[in-house]
């Protein structure tokens, strides 16, 4: 009997094995009719309530997109990383719009997520990661705006303390750098930058400790949204309103009320509604293959607004309309 040639026999076995594997494998998944965009915050505050309204507007306008809004309640990297993984593993997210808490420490998490989904950073950037797009404020320029405000509030100069949640967050670093740039050569002196781990109670304690340690302090600058209200509560409790000038960021209700009362000199307001709305809209277009929305520098700056006593009523009215409140 003629024996089967050894090479041919091996090829035949390989063919049979490949055929059996292919027959037993499940068919490829069809493309999802509805894409999921996860929107992940870096903490909890009224700022993100406004951003959520923007997400909801985009969600309502896009029949082939659903938005999963995720709040980082504790403001920790670990919690935010868990929400990113949850978005991928449980929600099967096609895109994630995230405000990174620690852009350096989370680089690997962001890069790994980018292998499975479109990653957009919003509010705060992770420029050295594999994110596709950053959408938010020019935070260095916003810091310079805050510097101009505090110089107007303190024409004779004086010492100021600066407050923020976490100094390692990209927007915190850039705002502080912009503030320092604006104050170079002026009579305003920065004592230090105090952090509170995104805890409003600690923010209040920092303000109180500052007033005790530096009784001659002339001004306070809060770089995150809750810092202004935290500073104001302490000033009111110690009868220091008007004696210490306050400049802050964003448009929490207590901040706007403080401006109306003359207790806060001014605020640099971002447009979180646009962060939510534009992030979802951009993600939807990119997921459809339209990459024309991505600029050459992979950055879309949304302008910040200066709110003071002369325009706070008009701004508050527009904000209430966005939120659907009166």
Name each model-derived stretch.
Residues 163, 171, 181-183, 278-326:
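Hinge/cleft segment of the Venus flytrap/periplasmic-binding protein
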Residues 40-53, 69-79, 102, 124, ...:
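Hinge/beta->alpha junction and helix N-cap segments in small-molecule ligand-binding domains
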Residues 94-113, 179, 191, 197-258:
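Hydrophobic alpha-helical
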Residues 19-22:
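C-terminal motif of bacterial Sec signal peptides marking the signal peptidase cleavage site
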């Amino acid at each position: 009997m003629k024996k089967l040639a050894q090479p041919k026999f091996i090829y035949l076995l390989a063919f049979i094995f490949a055929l059996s594997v292919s027959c037993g494998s499940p068919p490829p998944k069809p493309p999802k009719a509805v894409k999921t965009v996860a929107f992940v915050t870096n903490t909890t505050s009224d700022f993100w309530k406004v951003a959520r309204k923007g997400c909801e507007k985009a969600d309502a306008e896009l029949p082939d997109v659903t938005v999963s809004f995720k709040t980082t309640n504790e403001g920790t990297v670990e919690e935010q990383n868990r929400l990113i993984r949850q978005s991928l593993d449980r929600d099967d997210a096609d895109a994630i719009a995230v405000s990174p808490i620690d852009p350096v420490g989370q680089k690997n998490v962001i890069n790994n997520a980018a292998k499975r989904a479109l990653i957009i950073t919003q509010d705060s950037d992770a420029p050295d990661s594999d994110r596709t797009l950053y959408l938010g404020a020019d935070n260095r320029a916003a810091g310079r705006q805050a510097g101009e405000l505090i110089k107007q509030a303190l024409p004779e100069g004086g010492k100021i303390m600066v407050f923020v949640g976490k100094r390692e967050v990209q927007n915190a670093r850039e705002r502080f750098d912009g503030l320092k740039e604006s104050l170079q050569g002026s009579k305003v002196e920065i004592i230090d930058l105090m952090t509170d781990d995104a805890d409003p109670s600690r923010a209040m304690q920092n303000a109180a400790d500052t007033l005790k340690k530096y009784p001659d302090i002339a001004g306070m600058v809060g770089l995150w949204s809750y810092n202004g209200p935290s500073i104001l509560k302490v000033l009111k409790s110690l009868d220091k309103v008007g004696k210490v000038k306050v400049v802050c960021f964003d448009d929490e209700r207590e901040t706007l009320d403080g401006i109306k009362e003359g207790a806060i000199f001014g605020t640099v307001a971002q447009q979180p509604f646009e962060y939510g709305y534009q992030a979802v809209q951009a993600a939807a277009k990119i997921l459809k293959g339209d990459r024309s929305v991505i600029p050459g520098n992979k950055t879309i700056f949304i302008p910040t607004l200066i709110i003071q006593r002369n325009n706070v009523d008009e701004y508050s009215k527009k904000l209430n309309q966005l939120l659907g409140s009166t």
